[in-house]
């Protein structure tokens, strides 16, 4: 009797241990399966802000809304203000992402040079800038020399560059604008002038509206803001298209940077990874008029030097 009881007890103990072992292994497999098949959004939460480049803003706006739809516990606030403002704010820690059309080293110099060293660059796209005019100026192409003369005030009438007998109205951007820096560096090769009768406006949407509604107006915009209310001007006979930018034929372009102060983690890292995902790069980037960095056949360094890949 005692022997039978001992056998039954031992058998029950063995079954119990086996069951425990089976449950442990099953849980591990389930957890591994969940981490590989469940969406990454399951554990993502947090809130952060991005500010800066208005040229990049349409892409960040659209991507952030899609990301928040996928991750209900994440809140992202996106503002403009210009590249200079975005870089200053992320360096100061008032926002978590500083959007910029220029390298941080270009804007944060001299006394702020150490701040630039703390920032981590995430290049999410390429933006191209085109000179744009009111549709009735009678010109569809300008040379580099003509653009320089217009934006430095040497030429003030469209007839002097082959257009109508009409006063040229400049719509420029503030000095802090990354769009202005890109246009000056790669279209003009010189600084534009803040002339007394010119208009200065940082918001790209407002620039487009002003150019479309002001007779004789000229300005410049990222391709993502082009529409049929304005005219995009050819540069030295070359159109600002994604193909011409990618090949290096059209020179007025820059990387779109999303800077963080140090390496990102948590929801911030997840969002930046999402910006570089096929979902955003393969659809939103192209649909909004940007060029994926991977499509570029040339590269450009912080000094502006272009080399073939």
Where are these regions (language model features)?
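Exported/periplasmic ABC-transporter solute-binding proteins
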Residues: 4, 21-77, 81-110, 116-309
